[in-house]
Design a protein with these regions (language model features):
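Signal-transmission linkers at sensory-effector interfaces
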Residues: 1-37, 175
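Helix-loop-beta substructure at the N-terminus of cytosolic sensory domains
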Residues: 28-70, 81, 176-180
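Flexible loop/coil segments at beta-strand boundaries within sensory signal-transduction domains
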Residues: 63, 138-144, 152
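Regulatory sensory and allosteric helical modules in signal-transduction proteins
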Residues: 77-116, 120-126, 134
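A short, aliphatic-rich beta-strand micro-motif
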Residues: 131-139
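Intrinsically disordered, low-complexity protein-interaction/activation regions
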Residues: 178-221
Length: 221
């Protein structure tokens, strides 16, 4: 996909690149029915459109105060960070909560300037080697968070492609969790309903006095 998108940023070329990027993305996912494969394809498409090194889905819960990277796509040679970032301290990202509520993008273009206003956020991204970032929020039913691209090199002032990808991602997240809910209901039928708790944040768990079942346990059965 990246080889098919022009580097120039004039309005006409940017519009052409946008439509081309969407066409390539649609063609690559047209016959895909697996939700996780679709999310991976959307992340890849977003990263390639913006010339980014990495794209990820961050699900956030400010009541719990944590965020979790649930899906990630990395360019060849770029290390994955998903396993390292499974409990993001969301108190370090107050402006992200504001962006989610207002349905506005999050942009990092200058870490030094960001550090003057949001030092904790700047320190976090500096630690993980991210110098610039573009993120679009999503919020639907039980899912809320962001789709983000790290170190984008083009179209950084135009988040439309990322917003469209985020809308598609949240649809697939809802589909995944709906399927997990059906599986959970089947598994939970052998427990007393008053004794179980089902948690969907950052995955799926059935918690009871007899122990905990995860989404991976259910898939294995």
């Amino acid at each position: 996909m990246s080889s098919e998108i022009m580097q120039e940023t004039t309005p006409l070329v940017e519009c052409s690149a946008f439509h081309r990027g969407m066409s390539v993305l649609e063609a690559s996912l047209r016959n895909t029915e697996d939700s996780e494969a679709i999310i991976s394809g959307l992340l890849k498409g977003a990263a390639e459109f913006y010339g980014a090194s990495r794209a990820s889905v961050v699900e956030a819960d400010w009541d719990l105060g944590i965020g979790v990277i649930t899906y990630e796509w990395c360019k060849d040679g770029v290390p994955a960070q998903r396993n390292m970032l499974q409990c993001l301290p969301m108190e370090k990202f107050p402006r992200w909560r504001k962006a989610l509520r207002a349905n506005k993008p999050v942009v990092i273009s200058d870490l030094q300037r960001l550090e003057k206003v949001y030092p904790d956020e700047a320190a976090f991204f500096r630690e993980y080697g991210v110098t610039t970032l573009l993120a679009a929020p999503f919020s639907k039913r039980i899912n809320q968070g962001f789709i983000a691209v790290d170190d984008p090199t083009r179209y950084t002032d135009d988040p439309v492609f990322l917003f469209i990808a985020s809308y598609a991602v949240v649809v697939e997240l809802n589909e995944i969790k709906q399927q997990q809910s059906l599986l959970a209901a089947t598994k939970a039928s052998k427990y007393n309903p008053e004794d179980i708790h089902i948690n969907f944040f950052g995955g799926m768990e059935i918690i009871s006095s007899k122990g905990t079942l995860t989404g991976e346990d259910i898939k294995a059965d």
